[in-house]
From Swiss-Prot:
Signal peptide: none annotated. Keywords: Nucleus, Phosphoprotein, Repeat, Repressor, Transcription, Transcription regulation, Ubl conjugation. Acts as a transcriptional repressor. Interacts with MXI1 to repress MYC responsive genes and antagonize MYC oncogenic activities. Interacts with MAD-MAX heterodimers by binding to MAD. The heterodimer then represses transcription by tethering SIN3B to DNA. Also forms a complex with FOXK1 which represses transcription. With FOXK1, regulates cell cycle progression probably by repressing cell cycle inhibitor genes expression. The modification Phosphoserine is found at residues 667, 670. This is Paired amphipathic helix protein Sin3b. Gene3D superfamilies: Paired amphipathic helix (1.20.1160.11). Residues 1-26, 238-274, 661-702 are annotated as: Disordered. GO terms for molecular function: chromatin binding; transcription corepressor activity. Residues 383-550 are annotated as: Interaction with SUDS3 and HDAC1. Residues 1-25 have a biased composition (Gly residues). It comes from Mus musculus. GO terms for cellular component: autosome; cytoplasm; nucleus; Sin3-type complex; X chromosome; XY body; Y chromosome. It is found in: Nucleus.
């Protein structure tokens, strides 16, 4: 599949190799192996051992070329300039140049550079090659056909084939015959290249197609546009005369071979022309012009790809990938990776594409056009086939099965010829969690490399064994018999493929000649080939040992990281989640959800918390305070006074909120603080071992009270600090519990091993330690949590590298270590918030207000007596809202219950209060106090009479007349009302007050209203039977009407039989007894069931 054109393209075609051995410009080059490159590199290294700058410069050139920073002419220019004093190295570099490039150094000392893109050789002085290379210019090959014309011819051919397929949809044999004619013609054209033409002529092709398309004049005339010469000669009658002349035949075949070249999938994309080329019409097309771009199979392949991709833009992107390959910008393996998103879901097309790529490697395989049924298999649309699950498709019944002569009767019965595997790869999934992490990809890549090397070694070893057996056989034969011995295609073994691959890997393009020598003259060829195979075996084994060290290092670096799939994105996500904006958005979103529920009527408006957090271990609070103090103390940006205030908040104010005692050893003295930081490691190191301190070491802690709470109204900064502090405590608790869990598992494992090793004399060692698969840990399991705290301190002060910190955490806590990766960032954010708390006036006022209200008993207490403190807590809330007029107000409660502390946070709605005028609020508060108090009630009774009346005289007359009527009516009802009030006892002692904060009326405890009439209980007892009887009759009447409308007689009988236990199927044998009784004077029927045996318990 080389490209067409007189000059050819630099590098490779669609299936060619990138590098070739040195040779003449027109000769075929042998492939370069890795050992050749290493040998050349060793020569350069030895030559410039005393000049490392030159050697490093050569390596830099190779790196730039590998990264595609420079092209092939640039490599030639720079290498020639670098090795201008060493012509042997320049000549040796020819082995690694692409096909068509060569550097010659004649005796005159001038460089002759041959390039496929230049019309003639460029000669350069050997002494001044650097300046000459700057002036080198490469001209484009003028023999190439313009890209616009190529695409027109290609599309016309594809459109014509599709038109034939659509026209003869009901007669597929005609379409198949047409393809066979063109396949035969194209195959003969390819196989007769360079020899006198003996195949079908264009006239014969046109005649057969005319017979095939009889009655379809439009198709025949359009096909004649591809064969203009054949059509003209056929109608003029000169075709036979030309074919009878042998000399003309030979001349025509030579001219035909000049015009044709090996087809390729796509021509290399050349630079755009300055002028737009005028496109040729379809009347100028010929089958020779179309055939030089590829076979009909390749045309059909691209047509299928265009149909399955559907979008023209996607199809053009697919073509751009192939253009990159033809321009030598990507390799073959990289091209497969580029097209896998396009063809990955179409295995047939992808396999066909790979067969186009590997023409040389698969040269010993039968040609694709000769395979039985290949054209039909490519026409199968697996998307419309019958499915089983998601991985199998059924072949259509019209599919012609390939013939197999080795099958027996039982093979035909049991082997599958219908269902085809149609896998869906996990890499094609868009589900994020199914993707591999970079560390997993690295391990898979190492495994793939090891597997490929093992396959190469085993293939080579298997070939050595086969040839050794042949050599032993030859050693036992006479010389005459050795000359007569011939080997088959398996070369003395049982497999043809293994030996061929091994020999191709070593000898490259010369492998067919070597294999032919082994078949014809094994006595001479076997020893030579066997020696070469054994030398390669030793060389590859040594290389494998070096690779094993590299792979082992990669495994050790990536193994623990590959196990933890959460750590990949944890850092980035955690940084975003701990920002102040994210924390505020979280509670605001919960607040909005509650407001929507209240507005829609799904829940009653009530004061409920928006966020709830639980502190399960009080000791964690001390560890968190110690870490924060350790970092704050070492920050020069925080002044000494602020550091003292922060210590007060951490060790006095926070413990009071969490019902905890002041941390031992904390005081205002900086010396005591330093001693506490230095000695804090000892008590912490004893915690994971569950060792209890002696009784006289510390005083007995006070008894913990349950169901007590603290109330704290906070602003934004305090909310941010409390959230970050809770996050720190939660992560420390997870690490601590994970350390305890691993310690318990280790102790159980030790006890199990001790039981197993009681009968042994020697102590059983850890197999992983014995095999050196596991390194002994530097930290004991009992010290994991204290060691973790020490590592965090070291990370905060910068004495440990973050990468080392993460690797050590992974060794200790495996997949649970990711929680501690951002511990330093979390502590730094907390310290930053603490600095805001001690430097902001509003934050300090919030603390001062809490302490004052705590002394008044308005900031917490016993939960059972909270209603007594309701008015004081409301006053505290009102003061806090006025203090935080420009910020959000958060109601934070700390509830102690069952040894745990529960923190609830509620965002208060202060918008209405903020919109009111403070002066009006003060007047309203004064009015409420006067209205509720006794003084205000007595003084306000006479103030209204001093003002002028606000009503008219005529309305007053009407009102007086209505008032007289009401008085007369009341006098008439007085007697009856007096009778109704006889025997009635009532009291009106209810008391209420106004809440100053919310302006709502609240009823006082132990004040109520009641009314009771004497003798009503006896009368109710007398009337109750009559009421029950009336209700019972109403229900019976309704029930009877419902039964008549909805229940049939048969259904009622079945229910009665079931109730009486007369249906014995699936029932325990029993007997139902009916008893009549009276309840409240009403006759009722009671049913009692007696079982003949006890039913089974559920």
């Amino acid at each position: 599949m080389a490209h067409a054109g007189s000059g050819g393209s630099a590098g490779r075609g669609f299936g060619g190799s990138r590098w070739g051995r040195s040779g003449s410009g027109g000769h075929e080059k042998l492939p370069v192996h890795v050992e050749d490159a290493l040998t050349y590199l060793d020569q350069v290294k030895i030559r410039f051992g005393s000049d490392p700058a030159t050697y490093n410069g050569f390596l830099e050139i190779m790196k730039e070329f590998k990264s595609q920073s420079i092209d092939t002419p640039g490599v030639i220019r720079r290498v020639s300039q670098l090795f201008h004093e060493h012509p042997d190295l320049i000549v040796g570099f020819n082995a690694f140049l692409p096909l068509g490039y060569r550097i010659d150094i004649p005796k005159n000392g001038k460089l002759n550079i041959q390039s496929p893109l230049s019309s003639q050789d460029n000669s350069h002085s050997h002494g001044d090659c650097g300046e000459d290379f700057k002036q080198m210019s490469y001209k484009e090959d003028r023999g190439q056909v313009p890209l616009e014309s190529d695409s027109v011819e290609f599309n016309n051919a594809i459109s014509y084939v599709n038109k034939i397929k659509t026209r003869f949809l009901d007669h597929p044999e005609i379409y198949r015959s047409f393809l066979e004619i063109l396949h035969t013609y194209q195959k003969e054209q390819l196989h007769t290249k360079g020899r006198p033409f003996r195949g079908m002529s264009e006239e014969e092709v046109f005649t057969e197609v005319a017979n095939l398309f009889r009655g379809q004049e439009d198709l025949l005339s359009e096909f004649g546009q591809f064969l203009p010469e054949a059509k003209r000669s056929l109608f003029t009658g000169n075709g036979s005369c030309e074919m009878n002349s042998g000399q003309k035949n030979e001349e025509k075949s030579l001219e035909h071979n000049k015009k044709r070249s090996r087809p390729s999938l796509l021509r290399p994309v050349s630079a755009p022309a300055k002028k737009k080329m005028k496109l040729r019409g379809t009347k100028d097309l010929s089958i020779a012009a179309v055939g030089k771009y590829g076979t009909l199979q390749e045309f059909s392949f691209f047509d299928k790809v265009r149909r399955v991709l559907k979008s023209q833009e996607v199809y053009e992107n697919f073509l751009r990938c192939i253009a990159l390959f033809n321009q030598e910008l990507v390799s073959g393996s990289e091209l497969l990776q580029l097209v896998s998103p396009f063809l990955g879901k179409f295995p047939e097309l992808f396999a066909q594409f790979k067969s186009f790529l590997g023409v040389k490697e698969l040269s010993f395989a039968p040609p694709m056009s000769d395979r039985s049924g290949d054209g039909i298999s490519r026409e199968i649309d697996y998307a419309s086939c019958k499915r089983i699950g998601s991985s199998y498709r059924a072949l259509p019944k019209t599919y012609q099965q390939p013939k197999c002569s080795g099958r027996t009767a039982i093979c035909k019965e049991v082997l599958n010829d219908t269902w085809v595997s149609f896998p869906s790869w996990s890499e094609d999934s868009t589900f994020v969690s199914s993707k591999k992490t970079p560390y997993e990809e690295q391990l898979h890549r190492c495994e793939d490399e090891r597997f490929e090397l093992d396959v190469v070694l085993e293939t080579n070893l298997a070939t050595i064994r086969v040839l050794e057996s042949v050599q032993k056989k030859l050693s036992r034969m006479a010389p005459e018999d050795q000359e007569k011995l011939r080997l088959d295609d398996c070369l003395g073994g049982t497999s043809e493929v293994i030996q061929r691959r091994a020999i191709h890997r070593i000898y490259g393009d010369k492998a067919p000649e070597v294999i032919e020598s082994l078949k014809r003259n094994p006595a001479t060829a076997v020893p030579v080939v066997l020696k070469r195979l054994k030398a390669k075996e030793e060389e590859w084994r040594e290389a494998q040992q070096g690779f094993n060290k590299i792979w082992r290092e990669q495994y050790e670096k990536a193994y623990l990281k590959s196990l933890d799939h959460q750590a990949v994105n944890f850092k980035q996500n955690d940084t975003k989640a701990l920002r102040s904006k994210s924390l505020l958005n979280e509670i605001e979103s919960v607040y909005d959800e509650h407001q929507e529920q209240h507005s829609e009527g799904r829940s009653a408006p009530s004061s409920e918390p928006h966020l709830i957090f639980v502190y399960e271990d009080r000791q964690i609070l001390e560890d968190a305070a110690a870490l924060i103090s350790y970092y704050v103390k070492r920050q020069p940006a925080i002044q000494k006074e602020d550091q003292g205030t922060i210590r007060q908040l951490l060790h006095r104010f926070l413990p009071s909120l969490f019902f905890s005692q002041q941390c031992p050893g904390t005081s205002d003295d900086s010396a005591d603080e330093r001693d506490r930081d230095r000695d804090s490691a000892e008590p912490e190191r004893r915690r994971p071992t569950d060792e209890k301190p002696p009784a006289d070491a510390s005083p007995e802690p006070p008894k913990v009270l349950d169901d007590v709470y603290s109330l704290f109204f906070a602003n934004n900064n305090w909310y941010f600090f409390l959230r970050l502090h809770q996050t720190l405590c939660a992560r420390l608790l997870k690490i601590y519990r994970q350390a305890q869990k691993q310690l318990l598992e280790h102790r159980r494992e030790q006890e199990r091993e001790q039981l197993l090793c009681e009968g042994r004399r020697e102590k059983a060692a850890d197999p992983a330690m014995e095999l050196r698969l596991k390194q002994p840990s530097e930290v004991e399991l009992e010290e994991y949590y204290p060691a973790f705290l020490d590592m965090v301190r070291s990370l905060l002060e910068g004495s440990i590298d973050p990468t080392q910190y993460e690797d050590t955490l992974r060794e200790m806590f495996t997949i649970h270590a990711y929680i501690g990766f951002t511990m330093d960032k979390l502590v730094q954010n907390i310290a930053r918030q603490l600095h805001h708390l001690v430097s902001d006036d509003v934050c300090l006022k919030v603390v001062e207000l809490y302490l004052n209200e705590q002394q008044r008993g308005a900031a917490g207490g016993n939960l059972s007596s909270r209603c007594v403190r309701a008015a004081r807590e409301t006053s505290y809330q009102w003061k806090a809202e006025r203090c935080m007029a420009d910020e959000n107000c958060f109601k934070v409660m700390f509830l102690q219950r069952r040894g745990q502390v529960i923190m609830t946070i509620e965002l208060l709605d202060t918008e209405e209060a903020q919109t009111e005028d403070p002066v009006e609020v003060q007047h309203l508060a004064r009015y409420v106090e006067q209205y509720v108090g006794s003084e205000g009630a007595s003084s306000s009774s006479t103030e209204g009479f001093l003002l002028k009346p606000v009503f008219l005289q005529r309305n007053l007359k009407k009102f007086r007349r209505w008032q007289c009527e009401q008085v007369r009516a009341m006098r008439g009802e007085a007697k009856s009302s007096w009778k109704r009030l006889m025997g009635v006892e009532s009291a009106c002692d209810v008391d209420c007050r106004f809440r100053l904060g919310t302006h709502k009326m609240v009823f006082i405890v132990n004040s109520e209203d009641y009314m009771y009439r004497r003798g009503t209980l006896c009368r109710a007892k007398q009337v109750q039977p009559l009421v029950l009887l009336r209700h019972h009759r109403h229900f019976e009447e309704w029930h009877g009407r419902w039964l008549e409308d909805n229940v049939t007689v048969a259904a009622a009988g079945l229910v009665q039989d079931w109730l009486m236990g007369e249906e014995e199927e699936d029932m325990v044998p029993c007997k139902t007894l009916c008893e009549t009784a009276h309840v409240h004077g009403l006759p009722v029927t009671r049913y009692r069931v007696q079982y003949s045996r006890r039913p089974a318990s559920p």
